[in-house]
Amino acid sequence: MTITNDTINLVQSDLDNLPHFATEQNHTESNLYLNKNLVLKIFKNRNDIALMKNKEKKIDFLKTSNIEEFILPKHKIYIDNLFAGYSSNHFTDSKTLNNIYYLPLNKKIQILTTVSQNLESIHENCIILGDLNADNILYNNNIIKFADVDSANIGDLHCDNYSQALNNQNIDPFKINTVESDI
């Protein structure tokens, strides 16, 4: 494994030596690994050239952006010289929004108010989070961050999951999402 300011270069066997990063959600599009203070996200469907080009462009944009509400990509990851994912700083000691149920009511209100304000700020900048769910909203003290932001719709870089459905004229949101409770 070679790490520079902008990239991490791996060979496939390097992944065998990295611990999987345990999260509360099941990642269908990627595998997560932990390397010191970095979370490495390696996409599973790396043979889809168009998808990977779109993701790489999005990572390039996000790396140079200053969206404080996002856990931003730090490095692009290449495996055997092909774009394979990205790294981001580990948001140490954070919890997902799924853990909010155990907090006092005033803390819940504070966290959810901040989430709402952060979403408003993101939407004002014409960014739509493509994978917005409780597992991708992290908090630590009074800091709220959105994870898994490579699925966002940013300008002409569309949400990977929903862009085709959103191009239809008549959209029924219950047909876009597979779980009605996510809406």
Model feature map: region roles:
Residues 39, 84, 143-144:
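Hydrophobic residues embedded in beta-strands of well-ordered beta-sheets
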Residues 1-21:
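Juxta-kinase regulatory segment immediately upstream of eukaryotic protein kinase catalytic domains
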